[in-house]
């Protein structure tokens, strides 16, 4: 992730003409190479493979792969929004009369909020406001994915709409002038269906201890690479600012990185990337979880480390600005923790490359701290910081806007600042 915040970011996503290569070719690579853990599992997977050769299935696939562009200007727009739990994704499709390139060209829409836990049955209508457009790698052509946020019919953001508040913070003049960059490291775990046990693990048992799996290569060390690669290509096709992927410390766990992205775009891109991953695992017959500690015991949890910098941090003398930001973050530690994802107390134990949830800490190149500063940043005297506290199920709208608010808009008292500086051995 050190490279993510060193490059110039692409601030605005522009729709370009999609590749002529049919997007369906991408999914031909989604083949699960599961280790033979039990005869029943192997038989189940082989039956699935045989069914895919069925002539009926093939006819359905041929229809899915139809290119409609030669016959109509109409396109399909998939409207995507966050559901009632604050982490679940919902979507539905509509036909548009012609291709569009900007969210302002799209109509608002509505859905039944009583079926998503976001509105009562007697007044169930929730309004979708289109906010960001991405190319659709599943349908190809001029078809699009639309990230939306959610409002009452009167135009008020509903409680689960965290994007609206984030947009307010990022539109603040002081925040806007600092051009905040975010690089987000999304970890996730792939599970075998029906048993909800990590992909590649023997059902009800465990593989060898952690060590060989991080960025590992080989059938005995890497399970789920096809899904990770398919997701990577789908994100690139869609126009998501994805910057890399890797296998994680716990087998069956993977990570992708988004960024550097500016302001509200970071949240839009992460949520769309999550949507693509949900769809790909759906097609592959694999369960996706963002649980921050999917397996108890001596196994790493899943986080969503967030790398952050401002214009002042990236300029000469920026390390002093970073230290002031760390001081502010220390004083609002518990406020950030409460907003950084559910179940995070099971992950932030002080073990497995985490800091204790109850104690704020920072360090250079120390992955056991709340906030890590890279050695390059220390050496150059400018750069970025990494907030290692967010859980894998965090809302990127909340985390990114809270980082900006705490470091750019919130001012502690001089007394509190002095005490925190002394406690953290910070000279600011």
UniProtKB/Swiss-Prot annotation:
Residues 94-120 are annotated as: Disordered. Residues 75-155 form the GS beta-grasp domain. GO terms for biological process: glutamine biosynthetic process. It is an enzyme of class 6 (ligase). It comes from the Eukaryota. PROSITE patterns: GLNA_1, GLNA_ATP, GS_BETA_GRASP, GS_CATALYTIC. SUPFAM superfamilies: Glutamine synthetase, N-terminal domain (SSF54368), Glutamine synthetase/guanido kinase (SSF55931). Its EC number is 6.3.1.2. SMART domains: Gln-synt_C. Residues 1-49 form a transit peptide. It catalyses: L-glutamate + NH4(+) + ATP = L-glutamine + ADP + phosphate + H(+). This is Glutamine synthetase, chloroplastic. It comes from Brassica napus. The gene is GLN2.
